[in-house]
């Protein structure tokens, strides 16, 4: 699975992973702030 252009692919994978994590985290925080401690 090793390719000569693996560095670019690795950076691309990191970018996608960070973007996905950021989007999921933003949605979670937004939903959490919308309902303030419903089940505490």
From Swiss-Prot:
<keyword id="KW-0472">Membrane</keyword>
<protein>
    <recommendedName>
        <fullName>Protein P4</fullName>
    </recommendedName>
</protein>
<dbReference type="GO" id="GO:0016020">
    <property type="term" value="C:membrane"/>
</dbReference>
<comment type="function">
    <text>May interact with the viral DNA.</text>
</comment>
<dbReference type="GO" id="GO:0039641">
    <property type="term" value="C:viral inner membrane"/>
</dbReference>
<keyword id="KW-0812">Transmembrane</keyword>
<keyword id="KW-0946">Virion</keyword>
<keyword id="KW-1231">Capsid inner membrane protein</keyword>
<keyword id="KW-1133">Transmembrane helix</keyword>
<dbReference type="GO" id="GO:0055036">
    <property type="term" value="C:virion membrane"/>
</dbReference>
<feature type="transmembrane region" description="Helical">
    <location>
        <begin position="10"/>
        <end position="29"/>
    </location>
</feature>
């Amino acid at each position: 699975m090793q390719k000569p252009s693996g560095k670019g692919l690795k950076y691309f994978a990191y970018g996608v992973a960070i973007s996905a994590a950021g989007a999921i985290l933003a949605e979670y925080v937004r939903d959490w702030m919308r309902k303030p401690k419903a089940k505490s």
